Amino acid sequence: MSRYVGPVFKRSRRFGFSILETGKEFVKGKQRQYAPGQHGQRRGKLSDFGIHQLEKQKVRFMYGINERQFRNTFAIANKAKGVTGTAFLQLLESRLDNIVYRMGFAQTRRQARQLVNHGHFLLNGKKADIPSQRINVGDTIELRAKSQNVPTILASIETRVVAPWIEKDKFKGKLIRVPERKELNQEINEALIVEFYNK
């Protein structure tokens, strides 16, 4: 399944959940928080399968990755020690594009992925342009010198809050620890995703 590149607002309405994690897509004069379409306000009762699938899709769209990457990440988490659901979310959080987003270099994960693709960052001093690359504790991410005057990046640096598991000065950041489950989105029910893939 390909990556969704359409309007974020439509996806958020479908899920009844802000996939930007800010709620901004529900403002700007767009107050319709029900699902899109003619019958959007009459959201039908979902089957057990539908409930599990909706939760999976919600998280997949939130992190902006395709089905294959999502499933492969879950397979790694399923083999890890500890709670599978928590390990799964922590792996999603460890993607390079997500760390760039958490460091405040971008307003959204979609924007962060685009910045990574365009080669704006160094990982441990070397060019890094693969959004799905895993970042480990102790790794440093730095905005390249030639990118330090990009207006969209500077605007994000000025307005975004840096995640507490990251240490950062203006143009350089370091992953200092793995985030705890309580620090991640509380509207996610990862147990439903675990059940979906383990059926």
Curated annotation (Swiss-Prot):
Keyword Transferase: yes or no? no
Q: Which UniProt keywords apply?
A: Ribonucleoprotein, Ribosomal protein, RNA-binding, rRNA-binding
Question: Which PROSITE patterns is this protein grouped with?
Answer: RIBOSOMAL_S4, S4
GO terms for molecular function, please?
Answer: rRNA binding; structural constituent of ribosome
Query: Can you tell me which residues the record assigns to a coiled coil?
Result: none
Q: Which CDD domains match?
A: S4
Q: Which Pfam families match?
A: Ribosomal_S4 (PF00163), S4 (PF01479)
Q: Which GO terms describe its cellular component?
A: small ribosomal subunit
The answer to whether keyword tRNA-binding applies is no
Q: How does it assemble?
A: Part of the 30S ribosomal subunit. Contacts protein S5. The interaction surface between S4 and S5 is involved in control of translational fidelity.
Record function comment: One of the primary rRNA binding proteins, it binds directly to 16S rRNA where it nucleates assembly of the body of the 30S subunit.
The entry's family comment says: Belongs to the universal ribosomal protein uS4 family.
Put simply, this protein is called Small ribosomal subunit protein uS4
Which source organism? Mycoplasma mobile (strain ATCC 43663 / 163K / NCTC 11711) (Mesomycoplasma mobile)
